[in-house]
């Protein structure tokens, strides 16, 4: 398995004693599950190719209704992942570090785009790729908002050390977790309730 965490925010339209929560799951060794609005969810798999390259698989799904061709095309365009335009024949993003991700500074100046980038996946890629293939973590200065990053790294290091030193099974191979039921969730909850009580792990 891995771990999960929740973002907890004050609501705008609900009563003052309500909170909006959204959970995110890290599932070892390289999966992320993210909640979305209107029953949408997302799965990302960052599969290592070698020490400096990673293949990203991005899946969008709806828990309540089928996704028809029109909606599928809309989701692909929203993500900035249109084959032949955003993705080349080798599955590489056409907007990349070499061309500054084709950032449109004019659109930013005109107020037409906050980032000047096409698609949410490109925005994420800029953050990831701009660090370079291998980043020197010793120069990082993580803060309290990075607690999930800290926890994930600690978890992975513990798993590696446990495997190398004591022969413990790798993370994800020795837990009785119903993987088919793991999902990220969002909800409006009472401030007197914990998000763990509302979003119970592994329940349908």
Where are these regions (language model features)?
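C-terminal catalytic domain of Rieske-type non-heme iron oxygenases
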Residues: 1-204
């Amino acid at each position: 398995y891995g771990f999960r965490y929740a973002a907890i925010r004050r609501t705008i339209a609900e009563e003052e004693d309500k909170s909006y929560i959204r959970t995110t799951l890290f599932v070892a060794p390289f999966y992320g599950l993210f909640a979305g609005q209107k029953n949408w969810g997302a799965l990302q798999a960052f599969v290592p190719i070698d020490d400096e390259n990673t293949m990203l698989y991005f899946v969008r799904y709806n828990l309540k209704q089928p996704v028809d061709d029109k909606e599928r095309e809309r989701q692909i365009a929203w993500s900035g992942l249109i084959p032949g335009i955003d993705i080349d024949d080798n599955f590489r993003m056409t907007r990349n570090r070499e061309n500054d991700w084709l950032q449109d500074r004019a659109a930013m100046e005109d107020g037409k785009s906050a980032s000047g980038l096409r698609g949410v996946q490109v925005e994420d890629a800029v953050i990831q790729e701009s660090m370079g293939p291998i980043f020197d973590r010793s120069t990082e200065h993580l803060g309290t908002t990075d607690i999930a990053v800290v926890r994930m790294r600690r978890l992975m290091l513990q798993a590696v050390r446990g495997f190398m030193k004591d022969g413990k099974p790798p993370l994800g191979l020795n837990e009785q977790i119903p993987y088919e039921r793991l999902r990220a969730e969002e909800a409006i909850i009472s401030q007197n309730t914990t998000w763990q009580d509302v979003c119970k792990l592994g329940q349908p």
